[in-house]
Amino acid sequence: MPEDQAHAAMEEASPYSLLDICLSFLTTNLEKFCSARQDGTLCLQEPGVFPQEVADRLLQTIAFHGLLNDGTVGIFRGNQMRLKRACIRKAKISAVAFRKAFCHHKLVELDATGVNADITITDIISGLGSNKWIQQNLQCLVLNSLTLSLEDPYERCFSRLSGLRALSITNVLFYNEDLAEVASLPRLESLDISNTSITDITALLACKDRLKSLTMHHLKCLKMTTTQILDVVRELKHLNHLDISDDKQFTSDIALRLLEQKDILPNLVSLDVSGRKHVTDKAVEAFIQQRPSMQFVGLLATDAGYSEFLMGKGHLKVSGEANETQIAEALRRYSERAFFVREALFHLFSLTHVMEKTKPDILKLVVTGMRNHPMNLPVQLAASACVFNLTKQDLALGMPVRLLADVTHLLLKAMEHFPNHQQLQKNCLLSLCSDRILQDVPFNRFEAAKLVMQWLCNHEDQNMQRMAVAIISILAAKLSTEQTAQLGAELFIVRQLLQIVKQKTNQNSVDTTLKFTLSALWNLTDESPTTCRHFIENQGLELFMRVLESFPTESSIQQKVLGLLNNIAEVQELHSELMWKDFIDHISSLLHSVEVEVSYFAAGIIAHLISRGEQAWTLSRSQRNSLLDDLHSAILKWPTPECEMVAYRSFNPFFPLLGCFTTPGVQLWAVWAMQHVCSKNPSRYCSMLIEEGGLQHLYNIKEHEQTDPYVQQIAVAILDSLEKHIVRHGRPPPCKKQPQARLN
């Protein structure tokens, strides 16, 4: 791996620096660290002065998060922040706010790419020009994708910045007269006028003795002949870099004619002719051999770049499509150009089909392209396809979590921006359906679950349906109780999942789609009374009875169904819905299942229903007494499971059962369940039980004179485990509950 690629991969695998963490936290919590002035702008409460490098990074971080506006730029007023290199990309600020926040600093660089239309290039330069120090010392100015002037499109303003060395003014209505003014700047060395309204570049002759870098990508309005253009270029003898690339829209022979010139651009080290017609390997090689100092040639979207000389493996870097090295160089250099990003990704996709090694450096380049062009469908489509190929199966295991987090965020954004594009949605779901991503990578799982559910409700593709419910089942288990309740409260979600269960039951089909759908419903109803009510109101109970009857030998199906019905039984308000003789009869028969997982959940349903007393039991009293005896005897026959067969968000649903001294079978089920999870996963459940006040409940059982001996024995065993846990780890402090996935 080349040194720069290795560095990129190492950077992603490393933890964020302390400075990055602090700045990100400050950025997302500005209201906690700032107070508001009378005009509504923010100022930091602490009086200290930030070092210049930190101030620059803070500004960049706020801009990156899309939080730079008239209010937040107030932080940079005064002298508390000392800016030198200011990045305000895509800021939403007014001309007045810009002047107050930035024009008193000693700026040497300003990147104002894509700021909102309320501020023009004239506003920015007028503000900068009000500071004499900036007039003489501002060296680099980036004004891409802005409006020149709202009042007077012919207003000239660049001459104020006499110290300017580098100017980028792409995607702007920038005319010949503006070029003439810029070319007269006494120190100008680098100029990017890509995709402007220039029709004639003759004005560049005014800076022919200074200009070292000239970028003229996609000059669509140029009216000069090829000979006239070359006559100007020939005079620019000090050029080190020349870019005349295009988006494959024109048939001009300018590139080939330039390559054939022997007496032109003697100091050139970098030439970009990507997207140009008539470019051949022979012509490119001859041009480079006449200029042995050449370090880069751009050949993407041309017919060249396929010879051994141009493979890009030596000191000469080549952007192209012939191999991975060329494609990576293209993605690196053209990250701001949507057409070239799409071209490079298209060719990368064909390579990644057979990729066997993890390529974090390549994935990072794909991420950059996705981030820079969020609303460009062709880019997002190609990028999402590449992401899947780069992260599928075991390849994801070698990817840094930090990089996968960025990828996942961008995939979700793509799904949000293009909800009706089926192939894009499919690409994103394919990538998201990864254990590595769903289990290990930090991202907004709540928003992801909502997006996937919306897709599921709008599409009927069977293969994609399986993936969607798999994703939802895992995400739902990772959400907090509050988030699960909020997600399940959306009636359409429960209805859609039940529809899938009904469809599979009618087809008598036990497949992964059915299993994942049942898991999703199980997780969504966990400690969520609203979701449980939606389940009942949508005839979920009747449907799940059919499932139990349709698949009597499928223990994994029975376990999931009974697990969800446990959640329903926990909700006291829904108790009467379960007082249904056929339902109770079927559950009681499953209590005697040879599969401990099935018997366990059947017992849980019965325990919850019996725990509410004789008055709440509206069926036969003799049946209740019989069930109590069966419950007690069944639990005593259970073998110790080899692994953790269930997971719980909290022990709160168990505590009411622990007080049922007149129904020992109910208590026995509760303590057996608690001992099971505490013995299989003590670090999680012992702490949880102590935090939630379980010790007192267990002591009550231990000391109560009516306690069943089997219940008492298990309670004492749990207390011993808890005491050992406290000795080993100390008494755990109160903490937020962490959601836990069920074992599917």
UniProtKB/Swiss-Prot annotation:
Placement of LRR repeats on the sequence:
185-208, 216-236, 237-261
Q: Please give the InterPro entries that the UniProt record associates with this protein.
A: ARM-like (IPR011989), ARM-type_fold (IPR016024), Leu-rich_rpt (IPR001611), LRR_dom_sf (IPR032675), LRR_Zer-1 (IPR056845), ZER1-like_C (IPR055142), Zyg-11_UBL_adapter (IPR051341)
Identify the Gene3D superfamilies for this entry: Leucine-rich Repeat Variant, Ribonuclease Inhibitor
Q: Which domain of life is it from?
A: Eukaryota
Q: Which UniProt keywords apply?
A: Leucine-rich repeat, Repeat, Ubl conjugation pathway
An example Gene Ontology CC term for this record: Cul2-RING ubiquitin ligase complex
Any Gene Ontology biological process: protein quality control for misfolded or incompletely synthesized proteins
- Describe its function: Serves as substrate adapter subunit in the E3 ubiquitin ligase complex ZYG11B-CUL2-Elongin BC. Acts redudantly with ZER1 to target substrates bearing N-terminal glycine degrons for proteasomal degradation. Involved in the clearance of proteolytic fragments generated by caspase cleavage during apoptosis since N-terminal glycine degrons are strongly enriched at caspase cleavage sites. Also important in the quality control of protein N-myristoylation in which N-terminal glycine degrons are conditionally exposed after a failure of N-myristoylation.
Could you describe the subunit structure of this protein?
A: Interacts with ELOC/Elongin C. Part of an E3 ubiquitin ligase complex including ZYG11B, CUL2 and Elongin BC.
Similarity annotation: Belongs to the zyg-11 family.
**What is the protein name given in its UniProt record?**
Protein zyg-11 homolog B
Q: Give the lineage.
A: Eukaryota, Metazoa, Chordata, Craniata, Vertebrata
Name the encoding gene, please: Zyg11b
